[in-house]
Regions:
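Surface-exposed amphipathic alpha-helical segments
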Residues: 175-207
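N-terminal "mature-domain start" segment
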Residues: 1-81, 207
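Short, solvent-exposed coil/turn segments at beta-strand boundaries
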Residues: 140-142, 165-171
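Short, well-ordered beta-strand elements
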Residues: 90-93, 169-178
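Sec-exported extracytoplasmic/periplasmic mature domains
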Residues: 23, 30-33, 98-99, 108, ...
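A short acidic-to-branched-hydrophobic micro-motif
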Residues: 69-108
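Short Gly/Thr-rich strand-loop-strand
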Residues: 22, 42, 112-161, 202-207
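Short, surface-exposed beta-strand/loop micro-motifs that present aromatic residues
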Residues: 76-82, 159-166
C-alpha cells in the first residue's frame, strides 16, 4: 500500500468514521488501564479553540483546512498519587482535514510553531510554558513530528510528550502527560503507532 493510495482512500472517509479510529481504553498501554476516561467524543473547531491557546479562533482552524476531530483522554482517579514521574494522562486524537497538504501545514505552522512561539507565556490555570523541545519520532508510515512541552505552576512541573503524524488527510495525535520533567517519546510512539494502525484499518474498510 503506497502513501498515494492511502491519501486517496482518506478522501472517502466521512466524519462519522472518526469515532472508530480513536483508541478505546483497552487499547491504551497497560499503565493506563487503571485510569478513567475523562474526555471523549467530537472535537469541532469551536471546542478546539476554546481549549487552545489564548486568542485562538475556530476560524483560524477552518482556514487551516481542519474539518473536525474526535478524541479520547484518560486521566487519574482520585486515589492516585501525583508523584514525580507518574504518567497521569494519555490521549488519542484524530483530526480530519481537507487535504494532506493541510495536515502538513498544521503540523508545522500550528502545532510546532504555536508551542515554540509561546515559551515563557502564561497558558492558563496558573501555568507557564517553560519549554518546547522538538523530538525525532520514528516508525510512522508518513510524516511525523513530536514535542516535549514543559509547563510550570504552583504545583510544580508537568511534562507533555506529543506526537503528530499524517495518514492522508487525517492527522493522528498521541500524547502522555507526566508529573515532573520527563520525556515519554518511546511510549508516545507506541501509542501513536497503535492509533495509526487503527486509523489505517478503518480507512481501508477493515476497522
Amino acid at each position: 500500500m503506497t502513501s498515494f493510495s492511502i491519501d486517496r482512500a482518506t478522501y472517502s472517509v466521512g466524519e462519522s468514521a472518526l469515532v472508530d479510529m480513536v483508541l478505546g481504553k483497552p487499547e491504551f498501554p497497560e499503565q493506563f488501564q487503571g485510569h478513567q476516561v475523562i474526555r471523549e467524543g467530537p472535537l469541532d473547531n469551536d471546542a478546539l479553540a476554546e481549549n487552545g491557546f489564548e486568542g485562538t479562533t475556530a476560524e483560524r482552524f477552518r482556514l487551516a483546512g481542519r474539518v473536525t476531530g474526535v478524541m479520547r483522554e484518560l486521566g487519574p482517579t482520585s486515589n492516585m498519587a501525583m508523584s514525580d514521574g507518574f504518567d497521569f494522562m494519555a490521549a488519542s486524537v484524530v483530526h480530519l482535514f481537507d487535504s494532506p497538504d493541510s495536515v502538513h501545514g498544521w503540523m508545522h505552522d500550528i502545532f510546532l510553531k504555536d508551542f515554540e512561539d509561546r515559551v515563557g507565556e502564561s497558558v492558563g490555570q496558573g501555568h507557564q510554558l517553560v519549554s518546547a523541545t522538538r523530538l525525532e519520532p520514528q516508525g510512522f508510515f508518513d510524516e511525523s513530528v513530536a514535542l516535549k512541552v514543559l509547563q510550570g505552576g504552583v504545583d510544580g512541573l508537568i511534562s507533555s510528550t506529543v506526537v503528530d503524524f499524517r495518514v492522508g488527510r487525517l492527522l493522528g495525535v498521541a500524547f502522555i502527560g507526566t508529573v515532573g520533567d520527563h520525556e515519554r517519546l518511546d511510549q508516545v510512539m507506541q501509542l501513536g503507532q497503535a492509533l495509526e494502525k487503527r486509523m489505517v484499518s478503518v480507512v481501508l474498510g477493515s476497522g
